[in-house]
Amino acid sequence: MKNVTDSFVYLVGHCPFAGSFAFNTDILATNPINLSIVLGVLIFFGKGVLNDLLDNRKQRILSTIQNSEELRKKTIEQLERARDRLRKVEIEADEYRINGYSEIEREKTNLINATYDSLERLENYKNETLHFEQQRAINKVRQRVFQEALQGALGTLNSCLNSDLHFRTISANIGILGAMEEITD
């Protein structure tokens, strides 16, 4: 910075001053002077502004990095919580699945047992019905045999009995009944 100021003083001290204001058309002579003045002013005054801009930019970058780190940490925490929740949900889903399968097996077993019981009751009912029908058929056959035997016996009696035999049978029966009556008295 001191070199720029020294060169500026040197140039100002060696420039001839005219009494009036005029344009210098010598491009080679005027450009280095103008450039050195502009550069000197820019460096002198712009140094603070540039430092402020760089400091602000540095602070914004650091702030952005810190915010990004905080967001990253929060995101990692949320991810871990989500993973924990997912694990819990998977465990619950497995429990529901296992319980559901065991419930299905239990219901299946109950249904099989109920069906077996129903079939057993139907088999018993069928057997009872068959037994009842057999007894009924046997009773009908007995009744019919008895009726036919009775009719045959009555037919035989009617054909064999005459009035005299009939009268003696009745008298014998009356005598038996009379004897039974005396025994009971």
From Swiss-Prot:
Keywords carried by this UniProt record: ATP synthesis, CF(0), Chloroplast, Hydrogen ion transport, Ion transport, Membrane, Plastid, Thylakoid, Transmembrane, Transmembrane helix, Transport
Localization terms from the record: Plastid, Chloroplast thylakoid membrane
Entries under CDD domains matching the protein: ATP-synt_Fo_b
Main subcellular location: plastid
InterPro entries: ATP_synth_b/b'su_bac/chlpt
Membrane-crossing residue ranges in chain numbering: 7-29
Parts forming coiled coils: none
CC per GO annotation: chloroplast thylakoid membrane; proton-transporting ATP synthase complex
Membrane topology field: Single-pass membrane protein
Pfam families: ATP-synt_B
GO molecular function: proton-transporting ATP synthase activity, rotational mechanism
Description of how the protein assembles with itself and partners: F-type ATPases have 2 components, F(1) - the catalytic core - and F(0) - the membrane proton channel. F(1) has five subunits: alpha(3), beta(3), gamma(1), delta(1), epsilon(1). F(0) has four main subunits: a(1), b(1), b'(1) and c(10-14). The alpha and beta chains form an alternating ring which encloses part of the gamma chain. F(1) is attached to F(0) by a central stalk formed by the gamma and epsilon chains, while a peripheral stalk is formed by the delta, b and b' chains.
Record's miscellaneous remark: In plastids the F-type ATPase is also known as CF(1)CF(0).
Primary role: F(1)F(0) ATP synthase produces ATP from ADP in the presence of a proton or sodium gradient. F-type ATPases consist of two structural domains, F(1) containing the extramembraneous catalytic core and F(0) containing the membrane proton channel, linked together by a central stalk and a peripheral stalk. During catalysis, ATP synthesis in the catalytic domain of F(1) is coupled via a rotary mechanism of the central stalk subunits to proton translocation. Component of the F(0) channel, it forms part of the peripheral stalk, linking F(1) to F(0).
Record-stated family: Belongs to the ATPase B chain family.
Identification of the protein by name: ATP synthase subunit b, chloroplastic
Organism: Dioscorea elephantipes
Gene that specifies this protein: atpF
